[in-house]
C-alpha cells in the first residue's frame, strides 16, 4: 500500500528512516548497487522527497505501529453500533482502528487498496490502517470494542 513520506528521523545506528503517513517508519538507505537513493544523503534531497509515496508492507499486513497511543475507546453493545460503521468510513492519516469482538460475529469490508473481507468472531482483533474505507455488517448485532490509535498528542 502506498503511503506518503511526512518526516524523517535517524535510527539508533544513524540510518535515515522515513516516517510515513500511516505512522510506520521505513529505512531509506542509499547503498548502491543494491539500493539507489542518493536523495537521502542531503537535507535538500530528503526535503524534496517529502510528500512522495513509498510502499508500506506493514500496512499490507495490518500491523499497528508500536509507538501509537489509544485516542478513543467505544463499547458497542446490543445493536448500538454507530450508523457510520455500516455506511462506511475511513480514519484520518495516522489514525488506526482496532475492533475487538466480544460476542457474536461481524464482517468488515475493507476498501481499496486492500479490498478485503474480514470475518471476526469473539476475541478476534481486526486492525484497519488509516485512510482505508471500511464498513461493518452483522446480524444479529455483535458486542465489540472500537478503538482508535494515533501519535501522542502534545500536552
Q: Which residues does each predicted region cover?
A:
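Short beta-strand-initiation
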Residues: 13-15, 94-96, 121, 131
Amino acid at each position: 500500500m502506498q503511503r506518503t513520506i511526512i518526516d524523517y528521523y535517524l535510527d539508533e545506528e544513524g540510518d535515515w528512516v522515513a516516517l510515513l503517513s500511516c505512522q510506520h517508519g521505513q529505512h531509506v538507505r542509499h547503498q548502491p548497487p543494491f539500493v539507489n537513493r542518493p536523495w537521502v544523503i542531503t537535507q535538500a534531497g530528503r526535503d524534496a522527497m517529502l510528500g512522495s509515496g513509498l510502499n508500506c508492507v506493514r500496512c499490507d499486513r495490518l500491523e499497528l505501529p508500536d509507538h501509537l497511543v489509544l485516542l478513543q475507546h467505544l463499547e458497542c453493545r446490543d445493536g448500538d453500533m454507530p450508523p457510520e460503521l455500516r455506511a462506511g468510513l475511513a480514519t484520518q492519516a495516522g489514525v488506526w482502528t482496532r475492533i475487538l469482538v466480544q460476542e457474536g460475529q461481524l464482517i468488515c469490508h475493507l476498501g481499496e487498496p486492500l479490498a478485503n473481507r474480514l470475518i471476526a468472531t469473539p476475541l478476534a482483533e481486526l486492525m484497519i490502517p488509516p485512510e482505508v474505507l471500511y464498513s461493518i455488517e452483522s446480524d444479529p448485532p455483535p458486542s465489540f470494542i472500537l478503538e482508535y490509535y494515533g501519535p501522542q498528542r502534545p500536552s
